[in-house]
Amino acid sequence: MAVTDSTVVFISGVGKGIGAGIAKLYLSRPHHIVIGSVRDVSTPSVAELKASPTAPPGSKLLLVHIESTSSTDPAAAVEAIRAQGIDHIDIAIANAGAMPSTVPIEEVDTKDMLENYHINAIGPLLLFQALLPLLKKGTEPKWASVSTTAGSIGLVDPLAAWILPAYGGAKAALNWLTAGIASSQKEWMTTIALHPGLVQTGPGNWVAQKVGMGDKAPVTVGDSAASVVKLIDGLTKESNGKFYNAVDGTEVPW
């Protein structure tokens, strides 16, 4: 099967955690080309991803380098994608992000705010801009921004999200940008934001401990990844511009 007949999925941040889990699920499907961005191709977690069980017919993994704080990496990654003969993207998942600061709102400083904003909001925006020409050639293209309920302005008080002002504020900015993409590109692309659940990653476990949920977050990486893929599979034009909890499929207030 030619590349033009394959479903091409781009996932940022596949080096570990949810991104790696999502990549493995798409790679298990026939005729899926999975393009994953990583910061460092030499890490053990990336080696594990590359050593995943042999993909079915017509499926393969392509890794590209993107550092979330770089203003040039996304465009360079697109050139690397084109060099492999790939001329379209059907699904783009802006998953890469970080929670580098856990300083409360009473103490958070400018450096923490700017670092989070650059990684979690500007990075996905630059990725969207770089991938746009390839998305326009996709079949019923979809864009999903991996956000968090901590970025929901409507849930700041119920979730006590003010314990993560830099992270939550940056994700709120990502939500605004996602809504902007959904509105401006609604004629041809379905765009959503999604909350992947409180997942058993380093940041997820920290939050679980902070709010008294125990040592580990309630959602495994595998279950989160499966929920994200299921949600994206079921998207329709009517889904455009919405913010979903991937775990249960419900809408999250912006």
From Swiss-Prot:
Q: What induces it?
A: Expression is up-regulated during sexual development. Expression is also up-regulated during confrontation with the arthropod fungivore Drosophila melanogaster.
Q: Which GO terms describe its molecular function?
A: oxidoreductase activity
Which residues are NADP(+)-binding? 18, 37, 67, 95, 167, 171, 199, 201
Enzyme class comes to oxidoreductase
User: Which Gene Ontology cellular-component terms appear in the entry?
Assistant: cytoplasm
Q: Which domain of life is it from?
A: Eukaryota
Q: What is this protein called?
A: Short-chain dehydrogenase srdF
Q: Which organism is it from?
A: Neurospora crassa (strain ATCC 24698 / 74-OR23-1A / CBS 708.71 / DSM 1257 / FGSC 987)
Q: What's the source species' lineage?
A: Eukaryota, Fungi, Dikarya, Ascomycota, Pezizomycotina
